Structures are given as structure tokens and as C-alpha cells.
Design a protein with these regions (language model features):
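Donor-nucleotide binding loops and adjacent catalytic segments primarily
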Residues: 46, 51, 55, 178-274
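Conserved nucleotide-sugar phosphate-binding/catalytic loop shared by glycosyltransferases and other
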Residues: 7-15, 34-80, 231-235
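Alpha-helix C-terminal capping/helix-to-coil transition sites in glycosyltransferase folds
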Residues: 95-97, 141-142, 264-268
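An aromatic- and histidine-rich active-site surface loop
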Residues: 46-50, 100-119
Length: 279
């Protein structure tokens, strides 16, 4: 009988924001469907902990936090934190016999990438933004292959190492019916507005959507609105206050810190207002 091919063991690295985590989930699902064994390297406190509960990936958490804007004390602790996190990642790679490491960004990718290099494992990274984040910028020098969503993100690297591939999208999002199939122009029910500020929220949207809706209400032949406003987990009270202050009459609204099921939200909406970002 023919020898059975061993399933490749892939370590995904993505943490911190939905912009890193959601595209990584899309790739992880595709890898899993093609027979790979998917492991995930995340942090102890990042949003990826909650997001990944619905998926069948082996989750490994290490203690790693960001360095930007967090004071001099953390900066002095940074080398020791990075070293400990890298050693923890090396142990994870060796214990689980990882074959390849795939990084999508977030602070966890720095120790994970260093660990992969130490263990002589191939590194592939994907950058979702037009301008690379700090971790991916550093890791691009160590990576065997660099994937970018937008052209010319990594102009300093040899072109043979970089491939422009766009952003991975989860299957559930791809299957959202097109507007023509969902929206009836003769429908007189309220227009459904979805406001998406990204996983951390967007201040401009949180401050200006409610006053804008108030102006729309005062227009002749104004249609009523039904609003779902995703404001970021630390902005719920402030955004609620902006809506209360606007004293909306015909608008129904719901303030959400985070939208877990984006496919359902997209299907529900007639109009979407979102900030520019990775996705």
C-alpha cells in the first residue's frame, strides 16, 4: 500500500484586532479543509481568545503585549518580555512539530517569527494594509514569502519574495447574497443602516453618525432608519451619549461594541458606513 501523507502542521499567528484575526481565520479554514492541522498562536488577553472559540483550531497563548505608547517602564521590560515569549513560542513549535508558520500581524508575530527562524521553519507573512504594521515590517526581512493585500507595500524587498494577493475573505461573507437579491426598492419599512468602525471602533463615526441621522430626519419625505452601530468595546457609553444627545425621533438604533457575525450583519443591511482599514 502507498505511504499515507502526513497532514502538514501549520501555526497561524494573528492577534489584537479583527483586521489581523479575520483574514487569518479565512486562511486557517481553507487550510483545514485541505487537510492541514491548524494551530494558532495568540496572546493571553487579545480579542482572538473570544473570536476563536467558535473554531476548531488548537489555540496556544503566550504573554506578549504591544510596545507603542505604553510608557518607559514597559519599554525597559520589552527585551525580557520578547525573550520569554520567543522561548514559549519555540516550545510550542517543537512540541507540536509545526511544519510552517503563517503570520498575519499583531504583537504575537514578532516572538512567533523569531521562534520559527530559530527552529528553521519556513515563515510566510500576509499584510492586510497598504502600509505594513510594525511586526510584519520586521518579519518581512526573516520571511521566506511575503504576501501583500495592496501593491507596493514592501518595495524594499526583492520582487521574487513578494506577491500581491488581496485580502482573504471568510466563506460566510462570500456567500452573502448581492444587494439586488436582498433589497426591494418598493419596501416602505425603515432603511437598515450598519455602521462599522473596525474592531476597536472609529471616533469620527461614533461622534458624527447620530447628528447626521438627526439632520436626515428633518428632511422632507424622510424615511425612518433602523441602525446597528458598532462602536468598539471601550466606546459604548460615549457613543450611547452622542445618540441620546441627538434626540432622534423616528430612528431606532442599537449600539454594539463588536459584531461577531459579520455575514449576518451584511445580509441585514441596506446601507453600510464603515471606516477605511484593512478590510
Amino acid at each position: 500500500s502507498e505511504p499515507t501523507m502526513q497532514k502538514p502542521r501549520v501555526l497561524m499567528m494573528a492577534a489584537g484586532t479583527g483586521g489581523h484575526v479575520f483574514p487569518a481565520i479565512a486562511v486557517a479554514q481553507a487550510l483545514q479543509q485541505s487537510g492541514a492541522q491548524v494551530h494558532w498562536l495568540g496572546t493571553l488577553v487579545g480579542m482572538e481568545n473570544e473570536l476563536l472559540q467558535h473554531y476548531d483550531f488548537s489555540y496556544h497563548a503566550i504573554n506578549m503585549q504591544g510596545l507603542r505608547g505604553n510608557g518607559i517602564k514597559r519599554l525597559f521590560k520589552a527585551p525580557s518580555t520578547l525573550l520569554k515569549a520567543t522561548l514559549a513560542a519555540i516550545k510550542i513549535i517543537k512540541t507540536n512539530k509545526i511544519d510552517i508558520v503563517v503570520g498575519f500581524g499583531g504583537y504575537v508575530t514578532a516572538p512567533g517569527g523569531l521562534a520559527a527562524k530559530f527552529c528553521k521553519k519556513p515563515i510566510l507573512i500576509h499584510e492586510q494594509n497598504a502600509i505594513a504594521g510594525m511586526s510584519n515590517n520586521y518579519l518581512s526581512k526573516l520571511a521566506n514569502q511575503v504576501l501583500e493585500a495592496f501593491p507596493n507595500t514592501f518595495t524594499e524587498l526583492p520582487s521574487s519574495k513578494v506577491m500581491t494577493v488581496g485580502n482573504p475573505v471568510r466563506e460566510a461573507i462570500v456567500q452573502v447574497p448581492p444587494p439586488k437579491a436582498r433589497i426591494d426598492v418598493n419596501d416602505t419599512s425603515p432603511l437598515k443602516l450598519l455602521v462599522i468602525g473596525g474592531s476597536l471602533g472609529a471616533q469620527a463615526l461614533n461622534n458624527h453618525i447620530a447628528p447626521t441621522l438627526k439632520k436626515l430626519e428633518s428632511m422632507p419625505d424622510a424615511k425612518p432608519w433602523q441602525v446597528r452601530h458598532q462602536c468598539g468595546k471601550n466606546n459604548q457609553e460615549a457613543t450611547q451619549a452622542v445618540y441620546s444627545e441627538a434626540q432622534l425621533q423616528s430612528t431606532q438604533y442599537e449600539i454594539l461594541p463588536f459584531v461577531k457575525d459579520m455575514a449576518e450583519a451584511y445580509s441585514w443591511a441596506d446601507v453600510i458606513v464603515c471606516r477605511a482599514g484593512a478590510l
